[in-house]
Swiss-Prot record:
NCBIfam families reported in the protein's UniProt record: PRK13665.1
InterPro entries for this protein: FloA (IPR022853)
Keyword field contains Membrane: yes
Function: Found in functional membrane microdomains (FMM) that may be equivalent to eukaryotic membrane rafts. FMMs are highly dynamic and increase in number as cells age. Flotillins are thought to be important factors in membrane fluidity.
Oligomeric and partner information: Homooligomerizes.
Pfam families hit by this protein: FloA
Name of the protein in its database record: Flotillin-like protein FloA
Gene Ontology CC annotations of this record: membrane raft; plasma membrane
UniProt subcellular location: Cell membrane; Membrane raft
């Protein structure tokens, strides 16, 4: 291989390597597309995006859409939002939709909403086309104790000014449910709700439930009303059952106390009977001592025996028994 041929090969290889690096760093097709769309983006700007690890197509393509829609944006705005972790394409689409619908929305506001985790495009679309939120059955109890179940449809429109920091759909549903329960509870009976369900809508809508939320409530419509259980009767039945159990417990307590008192009386009777038997056992000893001392004569003892025998005979005739006989 001659030196001239080697030089040509090295030069050719160097040119190919340079072109490969150049086309890698500089997206020529994208640059041509931007020029054709009337968007002035320099090649050095595209190279700078590559060096900052930014995909040029994710900046230039949304910029082309924005310029064609008549929105004045630049690459620095889109690139800074991209580097902050935002969705550039969705923000630009939201700006275009807001511009077409004559909704005032700046890029800074849209970028802040997007970085806050909200879907700014969906919010703009909801501002143009309100969303209907359907609640589950909400149960309330009228004054007569009858349960009334109501299902509501809430028509809301996104409030772009309150998207950042405003409460979501769950809060709206919870507030509407609270208002429905309160309104049903203020009715005398279930007939009042069935005859005039729009009363619930008017009462709940007048409370300003969209305060502090990301939505503006346009209307609240009662879609369905159903009658549930007789809660008042259930509560009365439960109360009666509880009262019965309490009365039974108190009666059982009194019965136990009566049984204990009866057993105590029996014990006292047996105690007294034992004392009588003990006293009777001392009688012969007292008689013997009286005979020895001369305080009790034989005739007196004979009379005592006659009286005792007469008493036993009378008790036998009367069907009674002396304490000694029972022992």
């Amino acid at each position: 291989m001659t030196p001239e041929l080697l030089t040509v090969l090295l030069i050719t290889g160097g040119i190919l390597i340079f072109l490969a690096i150049f086309f890698t760093l500089v997206p020529i097709p994208l640059w041509i597309s931007s020029l054709a769309a009337g968007v002035r983006v320099s090649i050095f700007t595209l190279v700078g995006m590559r060096l900052r690890r930014v995909t040029p197509s994710k900046i230039v393509n949304p910029l082309i859409k924005a310029v064609k829609a008549g929105i004045n944006l630049n690459t620095n705005q889109l690139e800074s939002h991209y580097l902050a972790g935002g969705n550039v394409d969705r923000v630009v689409n939201a700006l275009i939709a807001a511009h077409r619908a004559n909704i005032e929305l700046s890029f800074e506001r849209a970028a802040a909403i997007d970085l806050a985790g909200r879907n700014v495009l969906e919010a703009v679309q909801m501002s143009v086309n309100p969303k209907v939120i359907e609640t589950p059955f909400i149960a309330g109890v009228a004054m007569n104790g009858i349960e009334v179940k109501a299902k509501a449809r809430i028509t809301v429109r996104a409030n772009i000014d309150r998207l950042v920091g405003g409460a979501g759909e769950e809060t709206v549903i919870a507030r509407v449910g609270e208002g429905v329960i309160s309104t049903i509870g203020s009715c005398q009976d279930q007939k009042e709700v069935l005859e005039n369900p729009e009363m619930i809508s008017r009462t709940v809508l007048a409370k300003g439930l969209d305060s502090g939320t990301a939505f503006e409530i346009l209307s609240i419509d009662i879609a369905d009303v159903d009658i549930g259980k007789n809660i008042g009767a259930v509560l009365q039945t439960d109360q009666a059952e509880a009262d019965k159990n309490i009365a039974q417990a108190k009666a059982e307590e009194r019965r136990a106390m009566a049984i204990a008192s009866e057993q105590e009386m029996k014990s006292r009777v047996e105690e007294m009977r034992a004392k009588v038997v003990a006293a009777e056992a001392e009688v012969p000893l007292a008689i013997a001592e009286a005979l020895r001392d001369g305080n009790f004569s034989v005739m007196d003892y004979a009379n005592y025996l006659n009286v005792t025998a007469d008493t036993k005979m009378r008790q036998a005739i009367g069907g009674q028994s002396s304490p000694n006989d029972t022992q």
